[in-house]
Amino acid sequence: MIKKAIAKVVEREDLTESEMIQVMDQVMSGEATPAQIAAFITALRMKGETVAEITGAARVMRDKVTRIRVGKNILDMDRDDINVDLETILDTCGTGGSCTNTFNVSTTVAFVVSACGVKVAKHGNRSVSSACGSADVLESLGVNLDVTQETIERCINEIGIGFLFAPALHGAMKYAIGPRKEIGIRTIFNILGPLTNPAGAGCQVLGVYREDLVEKLAHVLKNLGCKRGFVVHGQDGMDEMTLTAETRIAEVTPAGVATRLFRPEELGLSRCGMDDLRGGDAAANAVIVRRVLEGEKGPKRDIVLLNAAFGLVAAGRVVDPAAGLTMAAEAIDSGKALAQLEKLVKLTNE
């Protein structure tokens, strides 16, 4: 099948979802050669991946992942307006690849959102385009990445947050590692990670490195059964909601996909420069993350609050971003967000 698919894609013909499933099953089962894999993903990138193609690839990757078993729905009995359909596990994983060298915003957000009563299955990896990926900064903060599947499940179920280290859970990806490294370009594999959470997170805030991926990946999430989520891209290039410019947002709901531009001023947040959000290596970013969780004021805190606000909306914890902003600030200022980090460090090192 992969030979036929290569020939078709080279002629700039789109594959159906079913065809893509067949090809990716060959790739992830070790039936395709390295040369075939490289040719296919290069041709696909040159043509441009469609919603159907990305959906098919993600379905195969989800099928072959090592699954993390956690409770399906999380209810907060202190609330008056419990929404069973939306209160599910949240992921804040982005594609990476923005090349803006900011600190680890979505990783910091994960602790804040989990402190608000949302169970977070933070999916991530080591650095792709920056000096520090989510795995790198968590390791520097003291989180042990070399843990069992059972420990990850305990983290999510008992403390409300766990880190899902992609290389340890996506074993079928090993067949594509060599070809990807050798061709050295971004391919469909750069966007599959956030679409294939091993815990089956039903709600997401997904940052992407290209604006044209925003609406496309929102429709993919919809196809894959996402209950509610946001796909975002900062006009400054960030794969996060940003404070330096407007952010393109595609919201996924049961009703469909709606896209718009968001301005920081809508939530009363001040704009800043990119230098205000810069990070460094793992050690430097660990210091930044800890300072934000300890309550240090400034643009770094504000961008965390902004992204956390939308995460809380996605998880059904609040009805709008303004309420999410207030809840996120309280989670930091009360010390609960920092406590989540300390609990994760402790449990992963037991």
From Swiss-Prot:
Binding site residues for Mg(2+) 2: D239, E240
- Residues at which Mg(2+) 1 binds: S106, E240
Going by the record, the broad EC class of this enzyme is: transferase
Q: Which reactions appear under catalytic activity for this entry?
A: N-(5-phospho-beta-D-ribosyl)anthranilate + diphosphate = 5-phospho-alpha-D-ribose 1-diphosphate + anthranilate
Molecular function terms from GO: anthranilate phosphoribosyltransferase activity; magnesium ion binding
Kindly give the Pfam families that the UniProt entry links to this protein: Glycos_trans_3N (PF02885), Glycos_transf_3 (PF00591)
Name the Enzyme Commission number(s) assigned to this protein. Answer: 2.4.2.18
Keyword field contains Cell inner membrane: no
Q: How is the cofactor bound?
A: Binds 2 magnesium ions per monomer.
Which InterPro entries does UniProt cross-reference here?
Answer: Anthranilate_Pribosyl_Tfrase, Glycosyl_Trfase_fam3, Glycosyl_Trfase_fam3_N_dom, Glycosyl_Trfase_fam3_N_dom_sf, Nuc_phospho_transferase
**Keyword annotations of the record:** Amino-acid biosynthesis, Aromatic amino acid biosynthesis, Glycosyltransferase, Magnesium, Metal-binding, Transferase, Tryptophan biosynthesis
Assembly behavior = Homodimer.
Q: What is this protein called?
A: Anthranilate phosphoribosyltransferase
Lineage runs:
Bacteria, Pseudomonadati, Thermodesulfobacteriota, Desulfuromonadia, Geobacterales
